[in-house]
Regions:
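Short, conserved charged micro-motifs
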Residues: 127-131
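Active-site-adjacent helical/loop segments in soluble small-molecule enzymes
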Residues: 29-85
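Glycine-rich phosphate/pyrophosphate-binding loop at beta-loop-alpha junctions
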Residues: 1-38, 78-123
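Conserved small/polar residues in nucleotide/adenosyl-binding loops
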Residues: 136-143
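Generic alpha-helical secondary-structure signal
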Residues: 54, 132-135
């Protein structure tokens, strides 16, 4: 929508890549566009990283599952100076599969330096996993 508003006409994007899949449209609706063009003051865009943080905040602090598209307003608020102001943010949608939810939580924890992930490909032979464990428990990798 932001590109269409900037261009002054409905514009089709070549691709849309976001975790907010409920709002990921290549071509904005032709019926809503003139209304928004006339009445909208500003458009705020948020990065997927902002949505990940907003999702984790909702889960941890408010015990709510809200899909990424429904969190756009929460993520956008972080870009505005709204401290000590009354704000209404509509949260919607819980249409999120368990795999996506797990991935978003893991990304959020990584962004906050609360966990890290290591992937290792090992030969399928006895003792290989033990060698990797020794690397993590040794004071120096050379000792392993």
């Amino acid at each position: 929508m932001q590109v269409s508003l900037k261009n002054g006409k409905v514009t089709t994007l070549p691709k849309v890549n976001t975790i907010a899949d409920g709002t990921a449209v290549k071509t904005p609706g032709s019926k809503i566009f003139p209304y928004l063009q006339k009445n909208l003051d500003d458009v705020i865009t948020v990065e997927d990283e902002d949505l990940v943080v907003a999702f984790l905040d909702m889960v941890e602090n408010h015990k709510m599952i809200v899909e990424n598209s429904g969190l756009l307003t929460v993520a956008a608020l972080k870009q505005l100076n709204v401290k000590d102001k009354r704000i209404v943010s509509i949260l919607s949608g819980g249409n999120m599969d368990v795999i996506t939810m797990s991935s978003v939580v893991q990304q959020g924890l990584i962004l906050r330096d609360r966990i890290f992930t290591v992937s290792v490909l090992l030969p399928d032979k006895p003792g290989e996993l033990c060698r990797v464990c020794l690397l993590y428990t040794s004071p120096s990798p050379r000792d392993a």
